[in-house]
Design a protein with these regions (language model features):
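Bulky hydrophobic segments
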Residues: 1-136, 148-199
Length: 199
């Protein structure tokens, strides 16, 4: 039991550190000047395009049905917003789970805080792109929505699996407890002649 508690404590702070690192990285990316950010996206987009060419897939096929016609913009939205926040959603969700207590109220609070954190951080990263903090960029609520879509896909998935596992564990425990009570009652019945006479 003590080893399990120690492992949970270590995991808590590992995931907390990972969440902080990801958040710092996203904030730094948001603070990049427009020219630097565009150049970084272009380089990354070119690298992805090269990989697709090697396997015989065109960028047009990838963007088909997405509403995008600009490959660099598509890559920026997919990886810089949706994908990055999807990864953050997974790590942050586990962090909130690990810091929750063993009660329904605490677990629901963890989910609520994870949801508020995801939306708030998406808004913050867009705020950092305004002229108050950097140059050549601008905030977009559409990007906040894209960020939240990525974040909440993994957040909802992880919490759904977590809650389902807890419910199944409780159901299994009740069944085991019921089986033990039935077994104990049967043993008592066999040992008590008066109970058998009454039956």
């Amino acid at each position: 039991m003590k080893k399990k508690a120690n492992a949970r404590t270590v995991a808590k702070y590992i995931f907390l550190a990972a969440t902080i690192v990801i958040c710092v990285g996203l904030c730094v990316g948001s603070l990049l000047p427009g020219e630097t950010s565009a150049a970084t996206s272009d380089n990354f987009g070119g690298a992805v395009e090269g990989v697709l060419d090697d396997i015989g897939v065109s960028t047009g096929d990838v963007m088909d049905g997405t509403g995008f016609t600009d490959w660099q913009l598509f890559v920026r939205k997919l990886f810089g917003h949706f994908g990055a926040f999807m990864f953050l959603g997974a790590v942050a969700s586990v962090t909130f789970m690990l810091f929750s207590k063993d009660s329904t109220r605490s677990r629901l609070a963890a989910f609520g805080m994870a949801a508020v954190f995801g939306f708030s951080f998406a808004c913050l990263t867009e705020l950092l792109q305004t002229d108050l903090f950097t140059t050549g960029r601008g905030a977009s609520f559409d990007d906040v929505i894209t960020d939240c879509r990525g974040y909440f896909i993994t957040c909802l998935l992880f919490f759904a699996v977590w809650f389902a596992a807890i419910i199944l564990k409780h159901v299994a425990a009740k069944r085991r407890y019921g089986a033990l009570l039935s077994s104990a009652a049967a043993d008592e019945y066999e040992r008590d002649p008066s109970a058998q006479d009454k039956a």
